[in-house]
Regions:
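Small-molecule kinase domains that catalyze NTP-dependent phosphoryl transfer to phosphate-bearing small molecules
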Residues: 63-67, 141-190
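Pre-Walker A (Motif I) flank of P-loop NTPase domains
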Residues: 3-12, 98
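Glycine-rich phosphate-binding P-loop
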Residues: 10-26
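ATP-dependent small-molecule kinase phosphotransfer cores
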Residues: 43-99
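Conserved nucleotide-binding/hydrolysis micro-motifs of P-loop NTPases
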Residues: 107-109, 123-128, 186-188
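Short beta-strand-centered segment that lines the nucleotide-binding/catalytic pocket of NTP-utilizing
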Residues: 32-44
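Conserved phosphate-donor/acceptor-positioning beta-strand/loop module used by diverse small-molecule
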Residues: 113-133, 142-155
Length: 192
C-alpha cells in the first residue's frame, strides 16, 4: 500500500447526506468517489440485473431467504451474500490501488486491516425527513407526506443496521465502530 494514499469510508443514516458529503469530500481531496458505482460493478461480477442489485445490495438475508438458499446438505449463498461478496472484493481492490472515498457497504469493516478514516454521519429524524422530501421530484413530492417519508427513513435505517451488523458483528452507528461521528444537522453538508 502506498503511504500517501487517502482512504475515507462513510457510514450513514438514511437522509443524513452521506452521498453528497462523500462526493464533495472526494472532490475537495481530488480523489475517486464510490457509492452507486458499486451497483454497476456488482452487476458485471454477479450477472444479476441492475435493478435487482440496486434493490438488494446493502441488505442482509432474512430467515425466509436464508432458508430458501441453504439446503440440508450444502449451503448455497443467497443473492444478498453473492452481492456482498463481490462488493467486498471490489472495495478491497479499489482501496489497494487508489485514494478514494467509499460510501456505505460496511467499507469501514472491510478495510479494517488497512489505514483509513471511518466516518459515520447522522442527523435528527425531522431533518432527515426534510432532506429526503426536498430531494423528491415534484411529481413524487405531491404524493409523499412527511409521515410516509419518515416510515421510509426508518425502514432504510433498519435495513442498513441489519446489513452492517449481519456482515460485521459490530454495532452500526456506535462510537466505537468509527473514527469520527458527524451530526450533519449541526455541521451542515458543507461543514461535514
Amino acid at each position: 500500500m502506498t503511504q500517501n494514499k487517502i482512504i475515507v469510508t462513510i457510514g450513514r443514516q438514511f437522509g443524513s447526506g452521506g452521498h453528497e458529503v462523500g462526493r464533495r469530500l472526494a472532490s475537495e481531496l481530488g480523489i475517486s468517489f464510490y457509492d452507486h458505482e458499486f451497483v454497476d460493478m456488482a452487476v458485471k461480477k454477479t450477472g444479476f440485473h441492475a435493478d435487482y442489485v440496486k434493490d438488494n445490495e446493502e441488505k442482509a438475508p432474512d430467515f425466509v431467504s436464508g432458508a430458501m438458499f441453504s439446503g440440508m446438505e450444502m449451503y448455497q449463498p443467497s443473492p444478498y451474500d453473492r452481492i456482498q461478496a463481490e462488493e467486498y472484493k471490489l472495495i478491497r481492490d479499489i482501496a489497494s490501488k487508489e485514494s478514494c472515498v467509499i460510501v456505505g457497504r460496511a467499507a469501514d469493516y472491510i478495510l479494517s486491516d488497512q489505514s483509513h478514516v471511518s466516518i459515520f454521519l447522522f442527523a435528527p429524524m425531522e431533518d432527515r425527513v426534510k432532506r429526503k422530501m426536498a430531494l423528491l421530484k415534484p411529481e413524487d413530492a405531491a404524493k409523499m407526506t412527511p409521515a410516509a417519508m419518515e416510515k421510509i427513513v426508518k425502514q432504510m435505517d433498519k435495513q442498513r443496521k441489519r446489513y452492517y451488523e449481519y456482515y460485521t458483528d459490530m454495532k452500526w452507528g456506535a462510537r466505537d465502530s468509527y473514527d469520527l461521528l458527524i451530526n450533519t444537522s449541526q455541521s451542515g453538508i458543507d461543514g461535514a
